[in-house]
Amino acid sequence: MAKKQIDSRTERRVSAQPRLHQRARELQAYGTVNHALPLDLEEPVRVQVTNQLNQLLADTMTLRDLYKKCHWQVAGPTFYQLHLLFDKHYGEQNELVDSIAERIQLLGGVSLAMAADVAETTQIERPPRGREEVSVQLSRLIDAHQIIIQQTRPLARRAAELGDDGTNDLVISEVLRTNELQVWFLSEHLVDVPLVEARERSAAAAGAS
């Protein structure tokens, strides 16, 4: 039997050298979805949901990074507990970032990823580069949470109306509940209660008792 001739021009050479500096066209443009995913969700539905999820993703990534800034820069008598709390909340927000981004990809969309794109998209106010007082840090974080929470219920309702139960579950069970709990922990630090000595009651209050 004659040996098969190998055309050296078409034979792919194996090399241990890395192929560096490669570029190519995008596989998929941002704002689009894959056409033929067997998810039982129409393409217009997935486009609408992924667009809203990307807004939620941008704001969640911004809040996550704001927590890390506060974790590093916090100062004052409550440094220790807030330093730890901010880092705990950062970790929880980071998990939400991953869940939201993967939901976008699962639906056939393209998730935001780069800091510059997130900065252009987020609705959360950009803080200064320097350090701020604890009360201002807490207020900024709560304001950012509020922006996210205001998105969650309408997004969850709309997802349910469109038959996207997976997104509805993610937004309510993970995003909303995590943000609500974190707001509670932050807000209690802004209650003006003495640490060491109770305030004296007014004369009127003392007489009434």
Where do the model's predicted regions map?
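Disorder-to-helix initiation segments
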Residues: 34-56, 134
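Intrinsically disordered regulatory regions flanking bHLH/HLH domains
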Residues: 3, 16-19, 36-40, 44, ...
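Helix-loop segments that flank and shape redox-cofactor active sites
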Residues: 40-48, 63-88, 151, 155-167
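Acidic, low-complexity proline/glycine-rich segments
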Residues: 6-38
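Preference for long, well-ordered alpha-helical segments
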Residues: 148-209
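Acidic/histidine-rich alpha-helical segments that form the ligand environment
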Residues: 98, 102, 116-174
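Conserved alpha-helical segments that form or flank metal/cofactor-binding pockets of metalloenzymes
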Residues: 68, 74-117
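A structural signal for well-ordered alpha-helices, especially hydrophobic packing surfaces
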Residues: 57, 64, 71, 90, ...
